[in-house]
């Protein structure tokens, strides 16, 4: 939390601590989102989609604005990914969104851009795959897409003025190389 972007997320962990540490951070963030969205409503006896969306929303907000770290957390992407896995109706949209994130990362090198695009892709794909039915999940996925734009607003500004840091593709490719 004192190095790199000072953000508490997998991207900064990768840049400052390496791939294994970053993978650990990502797994914890995804599981945190999934656990709170899937199990908390079960434990309190209210397993409605609305209850799950409130639990998911709360876990994302808790990640981005943690009380114990003076309300300065990560950007919520890993945690949001975990919350989406708690909804079977979103599996395909989430997979397509994740693939769009990967493609954006590999083509442009911009993690934040990939995150924003993936949020919009999940929303768009879910709306069309649900025959444009508006329900609690539609609003939840809309919240996530808008929230990704808000939490990445500084990245967007830097992209527009040409000063955004690219994820070092060499680092990413070296991770997959055999040693």
Predicted region positions:
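Alpha-helical membrane segments and adjacent membrane-interface helices in multi-pass membrane proteins
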Residues: 19-42, 52-64, 76-78
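Transmembrane alpha-helix interface/packing and boundary motifs in multi-pass membrane proteins
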Residues: 24, 60-71, 104-112
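Structural signature of transmembrane alpha-helix termini at the membrane-water interface
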Residues: 34, 38, 42-43, 65-68, ...
């Amino acid at each position: 939390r004192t190095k790199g972007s000072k953000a508490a997320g997998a991207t900064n962990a990768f840049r400052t601590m390496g791939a294994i540490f970053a993978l650990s951070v990502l797994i914890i963030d995804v599981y945190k989102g999934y656990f709170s969205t899937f199990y908390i409503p079960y434990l309190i006896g209210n397993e409605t989609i609305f209850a799950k969306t409130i639990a998911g929303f709360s876990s994302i907000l808790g990640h981005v604005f943690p009380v114990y770290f003076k309300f300065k957390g990560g950007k919520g992407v890993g945690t949001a990914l975990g919350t989406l896995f708690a909804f079977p109706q979103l599996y395909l949209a989430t997979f397509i969104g994740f693939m769009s994130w990967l493609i954006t990362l590999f083509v442009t090198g911009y993690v934040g851009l990939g995150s924003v695009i993936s949020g919009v892709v999940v929303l768009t794909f879910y709306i069309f795959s649900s025959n444009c039915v508006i329900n609690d999940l539609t609003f939840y996925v809309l919240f996530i897409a808008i929230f990704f734009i808000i939490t990445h607003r500084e990245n967007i500004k830097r992209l527009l003025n040409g000063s955004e840091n690219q994820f070092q593709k060499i680092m990413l490719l070296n991770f997959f190389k055999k040693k």
